[in-house]
Amino acid sequence: MALVQKTEHQSHISRNVHALFIRNGRVHPLHPFKMNCSVYNSELTVYSKESTIMSERATAPTTAPAATSAPVASATSAASAENLPEPNAKLTTREKKWIVYDVGNSAFVMLSTAVVPIYANSLLQSAGQSNIVSTWGYAQTIASLIIAVMMPVLGSMADVQGMKVKFFTGFFLTGVVACCAMALPLSWLIFLVVCILATVGLNGSLTFYDSMLVDITSNERMDRVSSHGFAWGYIGSTIPFIACIALIFGGPSLFGWSTVACTRASFVITALWWVAFTIPLLTSYKQVHYRATAGQTGEAIRGTFAELGSTFRAIRKNKPLWMFMIAFFFYIDAVNTVISMSTSYGTQLGIDSTHLVMALLITQFVAFPSAIAYGKLAGRFGAKTMITTAVIAYICIVLFAAFFLRSATEFWILAILVGLFQGGIQALSRSYYGKIIPKNRANEYYGFYDIFGKTASIIGTFLVATTTSLTGNASVGVLSIAILLIVALIFLLLQRDPTRK
């Protein structure tokens, strides 16, 4: 169906209505927002049927029914409609400062994929633990479960004006502090707990970071900007990673430190890199789309709990969105499981840690141009088409890992294949979702996006860990990932793409 665009006349009406009912900084009791009336939310993408309902409510008399359970008003900063660049224009300063956070946090993602599992493996072996894959998998499952429970509620709260950056900062600091704490001499159990905290901090910050995308760019540029974020994250993270690897392997001879001490120092280096590339975003970000509070902030936050159910029902009623969410649930499960379990899987197969680390480094270099290329291809063929292509490719990758991966050479091949599609499917999923949700409720919707992704991660890592434990064969656990991808492919093929006419 045709998309609804806000006209100049509608903008004029919205400004006049807003000015009429707000006096001395307070919202009048008869403000249309207090009566559950939607007044032309800026850049809100809806279907024609839904827009008709919105229009009827916007013109309803002031004797409309009573207020909703959540005393909040939809609002959009005036900056949202100003100075928007052309779709093919160069990246703006605001977009670049958003992108560099991917450079910062990806350093920890890289470290937690390549170095942390190996270090945890040494702690587990020293403590007499044998099943590395299942133990690490259960730790990742716990972290995913915590995020899945927290994010919808916190995401809804963060849609209130000024709250998004506060929640983002809180989770970012949690991740950084936990990353530094990993450098302490800890037992294997305490180390896993700290790893869980660091993972929660990372993924929590990413939920709010992803939702910032709707504030810093337009629909037409989302695929491109999101792809650049992942691309520069991949290539940028190699700088601290190479420094850490050089320290781990060269530190003992250069400085006389033990390998363990050098590994712990790499955690601190990564945390400092993460902080450095977060500062530009923290000092420049402005929340454009938000729900302005009607009364006290605490009152509005309490109202968000009542809105969670209605938001989920709205997602269910929007069939294209719901179909995509189900598909996303299954395919991102597979992608995240491959990322989090690859090093442990290689270790279980007896592949040397040097080969594991270097192969994962190759993944980063391959993913950089691939993610940018995916963004360009999405502009030509559509984001959904490219996502579907990546899902098919991942099915082939999983089959290769399960049946043919037995040596370091094959692990290198796997790393290259993953690099070709990993960044593209992640970037386009983030931007495609941002196009089909209400912008001024982005955090709330991205909270559900995150719960689908993190709940899926629980299933994926738990499935691999449990299957490996029961069969004693890690390859069987990896093979189970293909089932999830096939289910995702079916739903993608059945979904109608709302972004294309």
Where are the language model's segments positioned?
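Juxtamembrane intracellular "pre-TM" segments in multi-pass secondary transporters
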Residues: 80-95, 286-325
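A membrane-interface helix-boundary motif in multi-pass transporters
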Residues: 248-272, 466-485
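Helix-to-loop junctions at the C-terminal end of transmembrane segments
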Residues: 150-162, 369-383
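Helix-loop boundary and gating motifs at the non-cytosolic
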Residues: 85-144, 320-359
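Multi-pass alpha-helical transporter architecture, strongest
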Residues: 273-284, 479-501
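Structural signature of the two symmetry-related core transmembrane helices
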Residues: 166-180, 385-400
